[in-house]
Amino acid sequence: VAYELIRAHPAAPLGLGARELARLGRGIASWGEVDCFAVYLAGPAWRRRQVPDSLILGWARSGDRWWRRAALVSTVPLNSRAQGGSGDRGRTLRLCRLLEGDRDPMVAKAMSWALRELAKRDPGAVRAHLEARSGALPALVVREVRNKLETGLKNPGRR
């Protein structure tokens, strides 16, 4: 609820920096908590350059699966029109390359989401990334992202 209140307040999101995000993210331990934190707070703050790339890269290097997931999910607002993003191939693909060997299901699913969101803005870059890195990426990521590029759906058999 706190994340939603901050997101809905006109000025509160503009006051978020590294210290505030650390405090608000303390104890995140489920996909729901992480995704709300990253989509509502961390990603938009990163998109607005209120926090440095080094903060998000630090999360990606964390031993905690939830912080690694938060790093990847924070790319969604960079690329989502609904979140105010205009597309950020560089930061998104940098995180994906950093975490491509991570086989934790929560991290792999977040990478799939990050790449599928970028594919809406820059399908050529995502296609090239898949071609170059498919051997290093989790199979789930390759399958879901390729499906998105080819059919527009993550799981085309589940309409």
Model-derived features with residue positions:
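Alpha-helical scaffold domains
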Residues: 1-159
